[in-house]
């Protein structure tokens, strides 16, 4: 009697591709969606940091503008001598 040998890796691959197509597609979808979430969160954090920097610059410019208005008004006032 001859012992029948099975090619186990081949059988596993065949079963996986026959019965696991949906699982592979879902796994790929999960990985892509997770990557998308990471990229969106990273870009959002960059934009928030940029917005904070722009707000600081705006505040500095606004303060400088107010100081210039005060200086202009002080210069245009007639001196009391």
UniProtKB/Swiss-Prot annotation:
GO terms for cellular component: cell division site; plasma membrane. Disulfide bonds: none annotated. One of its GO terms (biological process) is FtsZ-dependent cytokinesis. It is a single-pass type II membrane protein. Residues 43-81 are extracellular. The chain crosses the membrane at residues 22-42. The keyword ATP-binding does not apply. InterPro entries: Cell_div_FtsL. It comes from the Bacteria. Keywords: Cell cycle, Cell division, Cell membrane, Membrane, Transmembrane, Transmembrane helix. Residues 1-21 are cytoplasmic. Its main location: membrane. It is found in: Cell membrane. Essential cell division protein. Belongs to the FtsL family. This is Cell division protein FtsL. The gene is ftsL.
């Amino acid at each position: 009697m001859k012992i029948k040998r099975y090619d186990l890796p081949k059988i596993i691959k065949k079963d996986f591709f026959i019965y696991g197509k949906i699982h592979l597609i879902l796994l790929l979808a999960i990985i892509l969606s997770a990557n998308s979430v990471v990229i969106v969160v990273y870009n959002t954090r960059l934009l928030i940091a940029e917005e904070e920097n722009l707000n600081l610059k705006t505040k500095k410019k606004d303060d400088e503008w107010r100081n210039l208005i005060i200086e202009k008004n002080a210069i245009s006032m007639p001196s009391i001598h």
